[in-house]
Amino acid sequence: DNVRKSFELLIEFKEDKYEKLQKNEEYINYLNKNIVDFTTNAISTEFPIEGSQTIGLFLKISADIERIGDHAVNIAQRAELLQSEDRRFSHEAMDEIGIMSSLCVNILDELRIMNYDEFSSIVDKVDVIEENIDKTHHQFTVNQLSRLKDKKCTTENSVVYTKILTDFERIGDHGLNIAEGFYKAREAMKAMKMIEHQ
C-alpha cells in the first residue's frame, strides 16, 4: 500500500496521504520488531535445525518487507521535497517513474499468496518481473542522462529522479528476496513434514 501511495504523492502531494504513509511505516516497523523478538526467542528454544532455519527465513522475509517500507518512505520524502520547492518532473520522467512503480506493485501483488502450493512457482514469476525492473531502470537512467545533456531537466531534478528509480529498483530486489525466502521456507517445512509434499 505504501509503494502505491508514494507514487501517488509524486503525482499530487497531499499532506494527509503523506501522514498516513508515515503511520503505515511506523506500524510496519512495530510489526518487524515484534517478529524479530518472537523469532529470536523461538530460535533460542530447543528446535530441530530445520525449524530454526525456517524461523530464520521468516526473520529475513520480515526484514525485506521492512526495507520495502523504507524505500516507499524515501520516495514519499522526495515527493515532499519537490512539493516544498515547487519543482516538477517532466511528463516523460513521470511516465517512466509510473512504469517502475507499476512493475514494483506487480511484484508485491505476486507475493500475496494464499497457500503453500503457490510458493513453488513464485520465484520464477517474481524473477521475470525483477529482471524487467533492472532492464527498465538501466534504460530510464540512459534516458535521463540524455535529457540532462539536452538541458531538458535541471541537475537537481535529475538527482532526485535517479534516487527514486534506485528506490524502486531496490524494492524489486527485496521482492525477489521475499519470493526466494517463501520458496525456501516451503521446502524446509516439507522436509519437516509440516506440509504435504506436492
What are these regions (language model features)?
Residues 1-198:
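Cytosolic, long alpha-helical scaffolding segments
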